[in-house]
Every structure is written in C-alpha cells, then in structure tokens.
A protein has these predicted regions:
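Canonical P-loop GTPase G-domain recognition
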Residues: 2-66, 73-78, 82, 104-114, ...
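Amphipathic, alpha-helical segments enriched in basic
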Residues: 68, 72-76, 184, 232
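C-terminal effector/interaction modules appended to NTPase cores
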Residues: 87-292
C-alpha cells in the first residue's frame, strides 16, 4: 500500500542441514533471502538484493533544466542576512546551480541588494536573463526590481514542482483565505537549525499570516523529525521546502495531510500569496497558474 520496498532475511541457516537448506532455497520468494552472518553464506547475494531495492528516480520533472536552454542566463538571488550560514550556500541554491551547469546554461548569483544594478548592466548590453530565481523571503523586493517581461520564480517553488508537490501545495494555499481567530496552524520545518531572532518559521511566517488574514490564529511549530502523525486538528499546515528531507519523508507528510483532509502548502507559495505575486511567481508553469 505504501510502496515501500522490502526484503525478508532468514539468518543462521548454518545451523540447518544441507538438505534442509536446499529445501528452503527451493521455496523462497524473490523478496526473501537465506543467509548466515557467522560464515558469510549468501551475504553477497543479500548485498546485491539490498542494492536492487533502490527505487528508480521518481521525479516527474527536472529541477530547472527543462525551463532553460544552453547558454541561457539565469540569475539566482541569494540574500545574505543573519540567518544565512557562514561561508556557504544552502542546499537548494547549490542544487539549482548544479542543475543549471548540467544544462550548459549560465548561472549568476547576486544578493538582492545588487540585483537591480545587475539587471540594468545586462539589459543595457541587450542581454535579457531567461529566468530569475529568488529566495522566497526576498520576493517582494525582487519582484519590484525584475521587469515584468522577465520570468520570476523561487527556489521553493522549483523544489515543490521537482518533488511532485506543486499542485497539491498550490491548492492548499486557498485555506489561508478562510482562517479565523483561534484556528490552529502548524508550521513545520525539516531541518533542526538553531533558531535566531527573525527566524522565518517562528517569527516571519506567523507575522505574514496575521497581517494577511487580519485574524489571530494559534501557531504551533515542529522541526526535524517532530512532524505529528495526527494533523486533523489543524486548519492548515505550512511546510518548508523540505530540502533536508528525503523524497519519501516529504511525500509521507503530504499524504498524512491529504488523508486527514488538512490543506498543506509551503513557505514559498505562502510568501508569494501574501505579497501578491503568486501568479507571477508561477510564470515558468502556466498550467499551474490556472489553479489559482
């Protein structure tokens, strides 16, 4: 039902007679293997079976490669604030750069403070970026700086599509318009970073939701592996992009919400909604614009 691959391993077959082992070997199914940890019997076969359990790449879409052509210019907007890690880019930014490189396109990484001058420089030379991808927190500022004829989206929205969740999470944002005082909202993050002043999950997200809805919902927060099995008491769930979670865990969390009839959306979609640029942020995906 869950589509989880498995093996049944029978150990200590060295304690059985040769004839008994032969009899068992004739009846084992494909997902069963007979081994002996003490003398190594069939251990290599076990390793090969474990390796064969690795699922094929289930991503329906690439991260960004299908949106660009070789030598296209893609500008990535990466704010450097108190929450940014020292000396490195975060995982979604790294993965996006790698995907652009594999396509043979050009990636240019700038801070939001240098974005306008960067765009002016290239446009003055007749070079128009194919796409601008921004950190969701800078959506409002970046949207004002990027001309309407240049496609704009966010890392969060790219990853939502990449993991096959964009349509579900777009539909989930509709719950924001029906929030009332006292409604419970779960804000969930996949990583366990040390929270700082102005943290997006515990500080900025609640403030954006209160300002947008003009209501006073009750916020609860989880991080890492704390995601509850029972989410039925929540009006909606707002999840991070899930870059630190594997695909199976993220799909499990979404399935929990769907099974219990609880709308789920993600940070990037919510930020785009409250800043009034959700439709524009879906520019690379016109089929998704029809859902809002």
């Amino acid at each position: 039902e869950k589509g989880i691959p498995y093996l049944v391993v029978y150990n200590k077959i060295d304690l059985l007679s040769t004839e008994k082992i032969k009899d068992l070997a004739m009846s084992v199914r494909a997902e069963e293997v007979l081994v002996s940890a003490s003398d190594g019997m069939n251990i290599q076969e076990l390793k090969e079976k474990i390796a064969s359990l690795k699922p094929e790449d289930t991503h329906k879409y690439p991260l960004i490669q299908d949106l660009i052509e070789p030598l296209d210019l893609v500008i990535l907007v990466v704010p450097i604030d108190k929450a940014a890690p020292k000396g490195r880019l975060i995982l979604p930014q790294q993965q996006t750069i790698r995907d652009i490189l594999e396509r043979g396109a050009l990636s240019l990484v700038v801070r939001d403070t240098e974005l306008k001058s960067t765009l002016d420089h290239f446009l003055a030379q007749g070079v128009c970026p194919k796409l601008v991808v921004t950190d969701s927190q800078a959506f409002a500022r970046v949207s004002k700086a990027v001309p309407e004829n240049i496609t704009l989206t966010s890392f969060s929205i790219l990853f939502s599509r990449y993991k096959g969740e964009l349509e579900i999470q777009l539909k989930g944002i509709a719950a924001l318009s029906s929030i009332e005082d006292g409604d419970r909202i779960l804000i969930a993050e996949g990583c366990t970073h040390h929270r700082q002043c102005g943290d997006i999950g515990t500080c900025k997200m609640p403030e954006w939701i209160r300002n947008y809805t003009r209501k006073k919902p009750v916020f609860e927060f989880t991080s890492g592996t704390e995601f509850p099995d029972d989410v039925s008491s929540y009006k909606m769930v707002v999840h991070c992009g899930g870059c630190m979670l594997n695909e199976r865990e993220m799909k499990y969390r979404i399935a929990c919400c769907q099974d219990q009839g609880v709308p789920i959306t993600n940070y990037g979609i919510l930020i785009a909604q409250v800043t009034g640029i959700l439709r524009r942020s879906l520019g690379p995906f016109p089929e998704m614009q029809k859902l809002i």
